[in-house]
């Protein structure tokens, strides 16, 4: 129950304070709500192996869905607002958390947290996109050497390699 309550509270920042520019990035508000809820809940339950729970909750479904012929990328273009409901599903709720968690591990927890703060401060009461967040993290991570945009492109692709290639969300 705590996770659900905190998920909805996280939408006050990710979804309300900063709203996606368009529904292409609807996944960001959902993944951040889950991501932040987990960050807050975990310390209250130190006896739980949260990494194992995450793995069991997301990896199997993400692999299965992403490997199908009709798999969609996380970041999907939306031409008709009437079809916005079609964007929600296992790709957003199972694969997107893997991408976000890997991104945090790629840049480090402190840089990721500070980047999120800058993102919320910069775009408060406005709109932002996935590339906006990546630009902030990339600038902070390696003085703009361009490493994160290549990783972030995974959100726009389906059928990610499952061979353990560096930089894939399935590592």
Label each region the model flagged.
Residues 1-171:
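Hydrophobic alpha-helical and helix-loop surface patches within well-folded domains
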């Amino acid at each position: 129950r705590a996770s659900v309550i905190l998920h909805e509270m996280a939408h006050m920042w990710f979804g309300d304070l900063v709203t996606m520019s368009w529904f292409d990035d609807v996944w960001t508000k959902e993944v951040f709500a889950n991501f932040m809820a987990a960050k807050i809940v975990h310390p209250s339950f130190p006896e739980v192996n949260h990494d194992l729970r995450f793995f069991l909750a997301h990896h199997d479904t993400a692999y299965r869905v992403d490997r199908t012929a009709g798999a969609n990328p996380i970041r999907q273009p939306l031409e008709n607002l009437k079809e916005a409901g079609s964007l929600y599903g296992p790709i957003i709720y199972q694969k997107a958390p893997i991408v976000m968690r890997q991104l945090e591990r790629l840049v480090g927890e402190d840089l990721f947290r500070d980047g999120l703060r800058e993102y919320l401060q910069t775009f408060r009461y406005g709109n932002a996109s996935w590339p906006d967040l990546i630009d902030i993290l990339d600038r902070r991570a390696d003085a703009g050497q361009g490493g994160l945009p290549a990783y972030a492109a995974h959100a726009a692709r389906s059928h990610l390699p499952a061979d353990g290639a560096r930089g894939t969300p399935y590592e």
